[in-house]
Amino acid sequence: QDLSLRASEAGATITHNIPKHLIISGNYTLLYSIFHNIVDNAINYVEQANISIQLTNQDPSNLYFSITDNGQGVPAEALAHIFERFYRVDKGRSRKAGGTGLGLSIVKHAVIFHGGNITALNRQEGGLEYQFSLARRSR
């Protein structure tokens, strides 16, 4: 809810296909941080961001998600590092947007804690895509 308001204030839009009845088991704070930190980055670094949150697949063991934005993406050599603590792709721009460089590291550890994996890739049409899985039953 707070992300929708923040997105609206920043001129960004968020769409999703997450069913209202979907239950994700786990640590609420960590689960929230996964979605919040990825979406917050898009709002901070993409002018008039279009952000899409999709449940792309599910099976008895896992839920699979994709979060995309319409920004410029990141340099290919930076993709391998964006989940590292304190890593910033563009230090000058990052300083203006604020933050500590911990958001995506927190995301990665929260996904792992919930039995999943996460990757980030540049989309052919521009922007970033985060693909991640979460175990249906986590610790």
Descriptions of predicted regions:
Residues 49, 115-116:
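Conserved glycine-rich
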Residues 8, 13-23, 58:
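Conserved catalytic submotifs in the C-terminal HATPase_c
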Residues 69:
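Acidic ATP/Mg2+-coordinating residue in the GHKL
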Residues 42-43:
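Short helix-loop "hinge" at the ATP-lid/N-box region of the Bergerat-fold HATPase_c
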Residues 103, 107:
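Short alpha-helical Gxxx[C/S/T] motif in the catalytic ATP-binding
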Residues 74-88:
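Short conserved segment of the HATPase_c
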Residues 50-61:
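Short beta-strand/loop element within the Bergerat-fold HATPase_c
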